Amino acid sequence: MTDLTAQDAAWSTRDHLDDPVIGELRNRFGPDAFTVQATRTGIPVVWVKREQLLEVGDFLKKLPKPYVMLFDLHGMDERLRTHRDGLPAADFSVFYHLISIERNRDIMLKVALSENDLRVPTFTKLFPNANWYERETWEMFGIDIEGHPHLTRIMMPQTWEGHPLRKDYPARATEFDPFELTKAKQDLEMEALTFKPEDWGMKRGTDNEDFMFLNLGPNHPSAHGAFRIILQLDGEEIVDCVPDIGYHHRGAEKMGERQSWHSYIPYTDRIEYLGGCVNEMPYVLAVEKLAGITVSDRVNVIRVMLSELFRINSHLLYISTFIQDVGAMTPVFFAFTDRQKIYDLVEAITGFRMHPAWFRIGGVAHDLPRGWDRLLREFLEWMPKRLDSYEKAALRNTILKGRSQGVAAYGAKEALEWGTTGAGLRATGIDFDVRKWRPYSGYENFDFEVPVGGGVSDCYTRVMLKVEELRQSLRILQQCLDNMPEGPFKADHPLTTPPPKERTLQHIETLITHFLQVSWGPVMPAQESFQMVEATKGINSYYLTSDGSTMSYRTRVRTPSFAHLQQIPSAIRGSLVSDLIVYLGSIDFVMSDVDR
């Protein structure tokens, strides 16, 4: 692993023409083979020819200090985009976001496509986790993925017509015909849900016996949401399985094109409904990159404090429900007592509990109330002893350890191939935590450790890492309590939304700006920005494209749970059904995070 302290800040926002990988690409493919796009993403964005895509991807994967993870892959409808100076002509585009762990650097490849020739080769030959991303790209934009092993809808019903993220596709329910569910349509939808093993390359049996095909979900309590897995069983052994997602899809990325930069903030809370302010962080930071806003140290620490409170809140639910899945009920009731204390604190600060929508472009909604420090101090005195009791009473239990140790185990290579992040990746021995490697919101000023496993990620290791992460979050909260800076809770910037209230009472120009920004939304410069954060379940990121409007031209939301569920078949083949239940409990996912 590379010594991170000796590296340049690759995550900072600047033009990446000087990134070493640009020179490596030009040395291999020629100086005129690419168009390098200047953005505010903080990573090099390189347009490549479709015919060279796989060759370039293979080159990056085999470099010294290679790009080993496909972090994200999706598309964009470019037809209505007006600010495209210096970019290749394109009606649509597909982007491929790759990460090099050893370099601590990313690169984004883009392919320009004509409306009359919408096709790209499948990336699954290089990265197996491209499978689901390519299915969604085809589904949302109609871009054909040549050579894909199973190009079918993934978020929408199989009977759905059209490609929802195209600019000519309606965004409001009132633009559709009224919905009617006739008996014939109901029968058609039920038939579309019938699983046919042959469609997935599965055999119905061997020469000696038939396999059983079993639906787990979409309403099974151990599925942790509206989630269906079709199991191919030989007795109790899982021969193969097919995860079926999309039941919770709400069109979050399409909504981003209809809401202002400001009014989209409440939607971010609901992408992963347990994460609260953690989900607001990447979106707000990405918008602030577009606007060129720098917030005060006080805002940074407040944001970190709220994020870590929600991290603890989410981890407590995860740990207790994992224990419940294995067979113990008591820790769940303990956890909800502890989580109530967090909600009391969050409500005192923000006015809300689960979904505060409290971060703002340029700051936070209001300053900390009187008494916040007392509530936080009481929680910090309470929680460490409770954590010890969870570990002593349940997590050291020999039955729990016997059910979870060595189950659904994978190494670093498999984790990187499937885009695994968070505790699942760190359990394999890779200490990739965005708060440490690419610090944001002042995390570089906090003293905390990153828990790392011993080389194999199994169910027990993943849950124990989360316990240690809770302790580290408590350390961070203690530092927030002891070192809360003075200063404004909103930046003095024309695009801070809404501007500080007291200024609106003194300056008519500020009052007019307040009215326009709240009613229509702030106008962001035409640019692209990107921000990833260490969320509760792995790395969450927002990739925003502005066309100089009050609304986002394209809002791409990359969630960790989507990648983690795609990994299920590879990790669970050959195990028992009872092992699958433990594995699902160890992943830490919610379906809103998967389906968006």
From Swiss-Prot:
Reaction catalyzed: a quinone + NADH + 5 H(+)(in) = a quinol + NAD(+) + 4 H(+)(out)
Family label: In the N-terminal section; belongs to the complex I 30 kDa subunit family. In the C-terminal section; belongs to the complex I 49 kDa subunit family.
PROSITE patterns: COMPLEX1_49K
Name the record gives this protein: NADH-quinone oxidoreductase subunit C/D
InterPro entries: NADH_DH_suC (IPR010218), NADH_DH_suCD (IPR023062), NADH_Q_OxRdtase_suD (IPR001135), NADH_quin_OxRdtase_su_C/D-like (IPR037232), NADH_UbQ_OxRdtase_30kDa_su (IPR001268), NADH_UbQ_OxRdtase_49kDa_CS (IPR014029), NDH1_su_D/H (IPR022885), NiFe-Hase_large (IPR029014)
Lineage, uppermost ranks: Bacteria, Pseudomonadati, Pseudomonadota, Gammaproteobacteria, Enterobacterales
Biological function: NDH-1 shuttles electrons from NADH, via FMN and iron-sulfur (Fe-S) centers, to quinones in the respiratory chain. The immediate electron acceptor for the enzyme in this species is believed to be ubiquinone. Couples the redox reaction to proton translocation (for every two electrons transferred, four hydrogen ions are translocated across the cytoplasmic membrane), and thus conserves the redox energy in a proton gradient.
Subcellular localization, as worded in the UniProt entry: Cell inner membrane
Enzyme Commission number(s): 7.1.1.-
Organism of this sequence: Salmonella choleraesuis (strain SC-B67)
